[in-house]
């Protein structure tokens, strides 16, 4: 009896490895690599088994090209990218995870009688005011002074401080540098720095912490401005000289508002004039003062007509050579890190709903990214400690 086989297109096999590697064991990954080399041809039965394991429809194995994924968020990239099909499995998983959390919290808050988040879409019909005026309105909404970040000790302090202020108004802020708890599923900073999901009751900002600490603040503020306008975005800004914006006029406006929130013009110029160094050195000193990245500082200085584009390019060339590596030596333990990555209000809501019997422990484990009751209780203890 002849066993039916089918030579699957290598594009399909490569795509399977990209999006389903976490569902396949080593044996299946090795089999697929052998098929890709042409050393063996898969049987129909093997493809049926692979379809179930990978959760990929059986018919997709007979296509000549991978199907286009309909991920709405990918349509809202800051910078145009012609290679739309080349989306990493890590990004897809992270979008799926954050959408699940945002959807759950949206339903929870509606059920519990919460009011919609006032900040979302406040600037939707506000197109006449200057970037500086809008920045002042946003600062006023959060009760922040114009020099709010100058007095803080470090980049991390500034980020944490602003995150706390934002989340106190019901906006969800989640962070991570990899998918779930799998450090092998690292996020790529060249693919995206952050994204924002617009929801009336549970708007969510996600920050890719693979980015440097001094760059995260700009990403957070940039996405906050998108929330002000009520516009979803996948922030993949790369600080290039002439980026291919999908919506150039709007994104330039968002960037200028974000600049004004971080770099108040009056204080920026005052510090600039007080430093007796070269312009190159001034950029680094002011970046440290405002708890921002040298590139964001250089672009702002150019917009304030203090430096040339040539110096911006020089700063970009130097900073792009830096490789940021996070050190785990002497750092917080697993559960402290998990509690930090999760939005505190979200984690509290899940735990409260679970304790009341409205959410199953299995669903809670999935939402909070824990595997068992011990991990759940460890996380719960840290969340409750912060609530005191």
Residue map of PLM features:
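Active-site hotspot residues in diverse enzymes, especially metal/ion-binding acidic/histidine motifs
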Residues: 1-388
